[in-house]
Amino acid sequence: MLGRARKGYCAAVTRRIIGLLRASHFGPNLLVTILSYFFAQLYWWEGPAFVIAVGVFCGQLVVGWSNDLIDYKDDLLHNRQVKPLVSGEISVPLLQNCLRVILPIAILINLFGPLGFIGGGLSVFAIGWAVAYNFYFKFTIFSWLPFAVAFGSLPSCMALSKGQMPTLWMWLGGALVGTAAHFLNVIKDMEQDKASGIKGLPQRFGSKASLVSAFVLIATAVALLLLTFESLPSATP
């Protein structure tokens, strides 16, 4: 009897952990975290780079969890069972409590970690922009702006942590990739978003134009990276 209860408890905890990871939009979260580790290694050795990546991961948890909480009613309306809150894998109070815990952790790691107050401040600034998308920008023609700012800040905060001025390719390349990610992310729910009154730039463009825009933006970002490849920094202790 005790063994069954223990197994049931472990299964419930595991289900909640998986639900929390899914609510963070784990795929994109992991991708951004890996990219941050890559950029951090251009300036730092592996130890500090790992801490920087952890800070970015925590920031992505803030963004993803706040997004699912804000979108909960709309997700219910459209019966999006892929969302853990709608499927019942996790509850709203649980996600709210986790968000309250992770927010100060994300701020502290970014500000007091290897990024320092300047680089870490930019990272926290980017988190703020990403959360602002959930509250306001997603409904406007400037829905792309938080993505451009957040992705543009990702490599730039690494340079600032070493007292270096971020180069143009960091800001522009990151902004292009971020805007492309926004267009691609919206396509799958575009019609439901329109029905809910969400009128960001991709919704105004439509699916086909958004897909073409994303391709052009990514191609431009890749071309920019290739043109500036020799200017990539090398890690220093």
Model-derived segments and spans:
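Multi-pass alpha-helical membrane architecture of UbiA-family
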Residues: 2-237
